[in-house]
Amino acid sequence: MKVYCCEPHSYCSGVVKAFLLAKKAKRENPGKDVYLLGSLVHNEEAIKELQKEGFFLLDERKSDLFSSLKQIPDGSVLLFSAHGHPKSFDELAKTKNLIVYDATCEKVKKNLEAIAYFLHAGREVIFLGEKGHQEAAASVSIGEKVHFMDGKRINEFPYEEIKDKAPAFLCQTTMGDEEVRLASKSLQEKIPGVYIIDSRCESTKKRQFALRLAPKEADVIVILGSISSNNTMKLLSIAKESHPEARIFRVLDLEELKKKDLRPYSYCLLSSGASTSPRVYQECLSYLESL
């Protein structure tokens, strides 16, 4: 099979830094339990590897993270995820004398700082994101004047709640380009003075752009990544828009890929979310090229 590789692929720099910090936490605290508050990155395969190394996962899908944080023994080692977290988590960790390592992505940090800046300047903030995502929760928690816009329900946003004639608009770092465009257009129509910032990370933008520009003659698209990964699922949505004639598969790893019947296809586009490891990417690429 002919394979076209969409660049960039595999881990983004934020994910690499998160894993390096996790290893540092283990190395600097021998014999101590290290707790991951929520998935360090949104990829089950990567989290399983960390659990094999002795990390304890406090899963946001199974229990409220603030409640989970309360249950961690005082003096333990805590690793915050790459997706950001509310300030109240820092305060609780301090009262419990936890040894904290913060893997929050630098781009997410900058966005959180920008939101705080606008609030301090007396502005209201509209934040576009995925409901239930850790980054969205962290962003909205900064202040009461941060208004959440659900990426799946942009048209249902309560504009009447915005009193500021020049609010700031930011978005989750992993949102889709079309969602940002639609939200921006709607906001400009309703609130002409809105200050729009496309706060997606560069890795997200480049992956989405590369997929949109990929050869249209491809008859199958394989997107590597977890169903829990927002940036992966945005690639899936974009693939459906940009290549409507192609068959599209979203798989986590080689094991899942081998279960797909790829015999009818001859030209594949291969893309990946930012939490897919280089090893998984290379395994899948080699397999596709062997068909």
List the predicted regions and their residue ranges:
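The feature marks the mature, well-folded catalytic cores of soluble enzymes
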Residues: 1-291
